Design a protein with these regions (language model features):
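Conserved ABC ATPase "signature" region
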Residues: 95, 99-122
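Conserved ABC ATPase signature
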Residues: 126-133
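Catalytic Walker B motif of ABC-type/P-loop ATPase nucleotide-binding domains
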Residues: 151-155
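ABC ATPase "signature
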Residues: 210-211
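Conserved ABC transporter NBD signature motif
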Residues: 55-66, 70-71
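Helical segment within the ABC ATPase nucleotide-binding domain
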Residues: 165-178
Length: 241
């Protein structure tokens, strides 16, 4: 994914201001920032949910503005709140998404995802019968069913228990190792530090820091010992406010 001068305005309010970055295959980028920084707006623009006011977004070389259908086929966006169909079972959700993306021979993949996300015994259950964590797992399983090349997560661990958190982290890492480009936004900086190789920090819609975790930590430490990503984040955002 390549993003160049991404800008999103709501009337006179500039929510995202000339944001540029890239995410290579196999890379996990952490998008972080204070509340109201423009993270969710950025993710929704990248996914084509809210078209940008200006700038270019290329998904695997495909311009999102010029060919939105082809570009969106290559990605999956998992928002912070599961959006499910009230009258579709767990299994039917996966079938619906697979058919929507014209996924060939998806049945084996469907069964594998149900097992991976511990939903096998819930395949005939409706959303009203699922816990918050199970709904989160189902939403992400639906995002994985068509094997997208770009994965966009907004707070992927919400509602998960400790075992679910561990397995979700393993699932994200596995997709990156298989060649997916991953963008992950979270307020859990220890999660970002654990999973991501690159971090983009935004504030008031602008990029204020961008680089590998080690580069950002070194920038703050300046040879005076190691610092955590949390400490680096707090210092960088304080300087940018």
């Amino acid at each position: 994914m390549e993003v160049t001068n991404l800008t999103k305005n709501y009337g006179s309010v500039v929510a995202v201001d000339s944001l540029s970055f890239s995410v290579n295959r196999g890379q996990i980028l952490g998008l972080v920032g204070p509340n109201g920084a423009g993270k969710t707006t950025t993710l929704r623009a990248l996914a084509g949910v809210h078209p940008p006011t200006d700038g270019q977004i290329r998904i695997c070389g495909v311009d999102l503005r010029i060919d939105p259908v082809d570009a969106k086929k290559r990605l999956a966006f998992m928002p912070d709140e599961p959006r499910l169909f009230d009258y579709l079972t767990v299994e039917e959700h996966l079938q619906f998404v697979a058919r929507l993306y014209q996924t060939d021979d998806y049945h084996a993949k469907l069964d594998a995802l149900l097992e991976e996300f511990e939903l096998g015994d819930k395949r005939k259950a409706l959303p009203t019968e699922l816990s918050r964590g199970m709904k989160q797992k189902l939403m992400i399983a639906c995002g994985f069913i068509h094997s997208p090349e770009v994965l966009i997560f907004d707070e992927p661990l919400t509602g998960l228990d400790p075992l679910g958190i561990r397995r979700m982290k393993e699932s994200i890492i596995r997709r990156a190792k298989d060649g997916a480009s991953v963008i992950l936004s979270s307020h859990l900086l220890h999660l970002v530090e654990e999973l991501c190789d690159t971090v983009l920090i935004i504030q008031k819609g602008r990029r204020i820091a961008y680089g590998t975790i080690e580069e950002l930590k070194w920038q703050i430490a300046q040879g005076r010992g190691d610092v955590s990503l949390e400490e680096a984040f707090l210092r960088i955002t304080a300087a940018g406010s």
